[in-house]
């Protein structure tokens, strides 16, 4: 046997050893089965999933609205309170990636492709058909202002707060408490290690894998449709099935090469290029379009978003039956929740060494501001053009696939900006595909941070094959059915996320209670504070001392020396640490007091 053959054999053995059969096999079977059903019975599957989605929207849409707002409150609480001082790693650990590289990767994976796909189409849609419950006439200036506020609302704090819940919890459990990087471990502080390692944990990871792969595959399919429609609109190609297959194959091959090279190489490199191209495209439109109008609109859109947020965030419109809320807000909240395992886990993977406050500030606030700027540049440009020229609609409707290219075609050097737009779409899809493949691979390997390359290739290729088969054989109906199925996974996963918020709160409070802080005090101060039964003094040495917040009933003050005897709070994780090369072990932060 040659060295190459032995190497290939070893790679296969390593891949088989790395997978977790209780997760890998059921997830693969469910994915393949649903693809087959969606292709063979495309119309039946589409109707069935549409009815399922209607039932979810009508029956539990209020739940999506409630929990999405709750996640915003949870994220802000963690960022503003003392919880924000906790580091996602050892107390002295530095971030793994630079701030800008980190921001580029999380933004590209999070919703970059959606910004390109809906940057023009969504504001136009709200302008053309605003929600009846708001009472704003269509095609008016008031409708334009409301359209931008609604668009930023759908892509702002609520979307990223959903990602924060999963990403923050997984980063904390992995880099601070030594758990595998897997969704199931979010529940350990509540359900215990035994259930997490059992059937419940397997089911959570399978749901996460299925939702992630279907979400990425359907996005790839719809994205290819947008690229093809745009190129055909510009008169550059005549689209047929071979063009579709070729584009999917090229994107899948690039994504596979990137995911094999790892996060610190391919993914980081592509994300940086992607953000540079996206920034160049936005700058082109800003400078070549109505610049002053767009800058004024951006400030107004931010103000409109802040002003309308209290009205939008808990609005269920029970007296309105136009279906707008289900088609837009509830759809988006379900879509973001279904993507939360993928995006949240990927953000966790690249956030080692950040503090919780830094994590939330960057993940929650920065993308919201960037999204508002992006939608202002493209959305307000389209609204102004439609208001003045009336040429952004096709037969009185918004064409999502060609609306971006229609806008660019009306600007100077439209051909150049259109080429740039195609490149941005392609790179956004590549970064979404390779990060999605990496996340799925980590989940199927039981949380191993660096799974074998062979399994990474398996998931990346499966995403591309799923998109190609669904698009070419089943058509748009199959893609819609599978996207609806992905959104349906949001209902059970939203319950997992609510439990995770409670579990993480318990773990964070223990961490604060068990981690020492340093203050400079004198002996008289300590004795006096001890006599007054203050909460924050735990030693009697003059100089720098270790202190922590404790409840008044958990310590005893010696009447003569002021020394404290403190009872340690119970650890919701039972202080179990995994000693493994694959996972990050938490440094023991407790000390004698």
UniProtKB/Swiss-Prot annotation:
One of its GO terms (molecular function) is transmembrane transporter activity. The keyword Calcium does not apply. It is found in: Cell membrane. It is a multi-pass membrane protein. It comes from the Bacteria. One of its GO terms (cellular component) is extracellular region. It holds the Pfam family BCCT. PANTHER family: HIGH-AFFINITY CHOLINE TRANSPORT PROTEIN, HIGH-AFFINITY CHOLINE TRANSPORT PROTEIN-RELATED. Belongs to the BCCT transporter (TC 2.A.15) family. This is Uncharacterized transporter Rv0917. It comes from Mycobacterium tuberculosis (strain ATCC 25618 / H37Rv).
